[in-house]
């Protein structure tokens, strides 16, 4: 059964309000881009069936209360390595909640679950390769629940796929997070490419929310 939240009509409507206008992103450009570095998917992609996968992870159907935490916007463009936009690319995101716990039965973190947080979102890019999500800034979390030591920095998982340009699984990080430098996952990415996975925030003119730009280059 097709999730009604993942229809092209619903995605197009929500992308218009969450991703903003084309002027935010600008036109495509010609040139050779660095391929977005791949990182591990990790063990916590939310298992199906997914009750909701729309682009607003902060508000569930039938709920009057939004997810706990600081609401942010995440927007970007999916392109090939020459900067040409890729329409109809599928963008999956998933992440820990405000307390650092995933909506996954295998997450043994004792932090609380958030009954108002969706945990996963899926979008299709528009004709200009744009996507957009409304979510919350995830918390860092200890690796002890997975039998390891240390902490993971704040991050959002991405899986992006296009029928001709291929796919990448990666993670988006937040500028200024002191945990990035010693992160076991980030250490697996070449130092000269790590900046491609770290985003800074600007204020979104329409909503006043922190806006993180995260572009993906496939090829």
Can you name each region flagged by the protein language model?
Residues 29-219:
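Beta-strand-dominated extracellular/periplasmic modules and repeats
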Residues 1-22:
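N-terminal secretory signal peptides and thylakoid transit peptides that target proteins
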